[in-house]
Amino acid sequence: MVSKKIIIIGTTASNLYGFRKDFILSCLAQNYHVYAFVSEYTSEWLEKIKSLGVTLVTYKLSRGGLNPLADLGSTFQLIKKIKEIQPDIVFSYSTKPVIYATLAAYRTKVPYIYGMIEGL
């Protein structure tokens, strides 16, 4: 049986592990192949995320940056990576990942796209 693929896109590895760990484990329990995208990380947090059994993907994103060209570059990078994986679902959280990952997922025709702005 071919498992479905889900991409979870956030910013920091520590945030992904701390706040999305249960969600990741739930997806894995339902036989999803989970790809975790992070833009800020240390080797310690990368190892913790890998230990969950996910495929870890890093990408460039300036969380506080105001350069539209850099953000456009991040969007194109996400488009390329999402196109390679061909997921069934993209779930993003935090402001910039929701904006740019949603555009990238729509551009690559991902069937199910979800974005969650934290704190709302």
Language model segments and positions:
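Short His-centered aromatic/hydrophobic patch
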Residues: S92-V98, I117
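An amphipathic, basic-hydrophobic alpha-helix
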Residues: K60-I89, I99-R107
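Helix C-cap/helix->beta junction micro-motif
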Residues: Q30, L52, I85, T108-K109
